[in-house]
Swiss-Prot record:
This is tRNA (guanine-N(1)-)-methyltransferase. Homodimer. It comes from Symbiobacterium thermophilum (strain DSM 24528 / JCM 14929 / IAM 14863 / T). The lineage of its organism: Bacteria, Bacillati, Bacillota, Clostridia, Eubacteriales. Keywords: Cytoplasm, Methyltransferase, S-adenosyl-L-methionine, Transferase, tRNA processing. Its EC number is 2.1.1.228.
Length: 247
């Protein structure tokens, strides 16, 4: 997969692509992560990428010309035989990003993520986008951090990026439930012991315990997720029993 992040601040993004799992996946040829400097496509000699809004108002807006130029250039770098890229505008007005959206994007060949700065975009820039994504109901100083969230969530789903594919499947939200409690050595620490079931060696019982713990944690912390979670009839009865005791 080719992922290009378009930004006026490449130094925010580039170091992340060289580190840890992302860096190793790039070295192995599993991922191709690139940063495109929008300033390189500015038309003025001072590489201006912002200007005052028509009609007045506070702040500055991203100019359309550099962004159009950067996106068109990035789209021309698509891998041979790749489908047209998904062009994603990082925008607090966009669709809320979640695990299912990450799974959808992980099936693509080529992603282009546009990071804004200043007070926002010239409205005409939206014509470039196939998607507009928000990572939450708050405002950041720019789209770079949000774009990196998308990159992390998407790339970890690509085969070979994580050493253990099962770990990506078992994580919170992938199953529709939050992940239950986990423990490592020592078996006892400051009076807190690891649950005996986890040291029993009974893998079937351990799997059932983990599923129930995940269900309980989701019920306690994110009950909204249970509406769309894939639960068995027995699990739904268990949730109803918890609700009854809670009321």
């Amino acid at each position: 997969m080719l992922i290009q992040i378009l930004t006026i601040h490449p130094a925010i993004v580039a170091p992340v692509f060289r580190e840890s799992i992302l860096g190793r996946a790039c070295e192995a040829g599993i991922l191709d992560l690139r940063v495109v400097n929008i300033r390189d496509f500015a038309l003025s000699k001072h590489q201006q990428t912002d200007d005052y809004p028509y009609g007045g108002g506070a702040g500055l807006l991203m100019k359309p010309e550099p962004v159009f130029g950067a996106v068109r250039w990035a789209a021309g770098r698509a891998p041979a035989g790749a489908r047209p890229p998904r062009v994603i505008l990082m925008d607090p007005q966009g669709r809320r990003f979640d695990q299912r959206y990450a799974e959808e994007l992980a099936r693509e060949d080529h992603l282009i993520l546009i990071c804004g700065r200043y007070e926002g975009f010239d409205e005409r820039i939206r014509a470039l986008a196939t998607d507009e994504i928000s990572i939450g109901d708050y405002v950041l100083m720019g789209g770079e951090v949000a774009a990196l969230v998308v990159v992390e969530a998407v790339t970890r789903l690509i085969p070979g990026v994580l050493g253990d594919l099962e770990s990506s499947v078992a994580e919170s939200h992938t199953s529709g439930l939050l992940e239950g409690p986990q423990y490592t050595r020592p078996a006892e620490f400051e009076g807190m012991r690891v649950p005996e079931i986890l040291t029993s060696g009974n893998h079937g019982a351990i799997a059932r315990w983990r599923r129930e713990q995940a269900l309980r944690r989701t019920f306690e912390r994110r009950p909204d997720l249970l509406q769309s979670a894939d639960l068995t009839p027995e699990e739904r009865r268990l949730v109803e029993a918890w609700r009854t005791r809670q009321s």
